Regions:
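Conserved short alpha-helical segments that host acidic/polar catalytic motifs at enzyme active sites
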Residues: 1-124
Length: 124
């Protein structure tokens, strides 16, 4: 579920059941994005880590919580899932001076690397 505002782009892929956080937003992705922003005290990666940890504790069941976010200069990734790694595991590839992240490798391209479960990363 993608979401954007004037400052950044946010992508959520997953399923959370019984989330108990207080956050503004019209859709789930916007609520999670605003929750992460509320944790940001100048270190976006630390804010993402803290927010994801709290959301996991305040959620009855996390089937998957894959997050990508970027402000145009910094891109961040968090990947967590409890089941079905063939579906929820993310992949990355470096090509043409860019880092690519997606849910499934492109067909016919063999240089995609699997992103481990419970990964938190700054994407160069």
């Amino acid at each position: 579920m993608p979401f954007s505002d004037d400052d950044s782009v946010f992508i959520f892929n997953g399923e959370l059941r019984g989330v108990k956080i207080k956050s503004e937003g019209r859709i789930g992705a916007e609520k999670i994005y605003n929750y992460i922003r509320r944790m940001d005290k100048g270190d976006k990666l630390q804010a993402l880590d803290k927010a994801v940890s709290i959301i996991k504790r305040r959620t009855e069941y996390v089937r998957a919580m894959n997050i990508l976010m970027s402000d145009g200069e910094t891109s961040l990734l968090s990947s967590d899932y409890s089941e079905d790694p063939d579906y929820f595991q993310m992949h990355r590839r470096r090509s043409g001076g860019m880092e690519w992240v997606c849910s499934q490798p492109y067909p016919g391209e063999n240089d995609w690397q699997r992103i481990a479960n419970a990964t938190l990363a700054l994407i160069p």
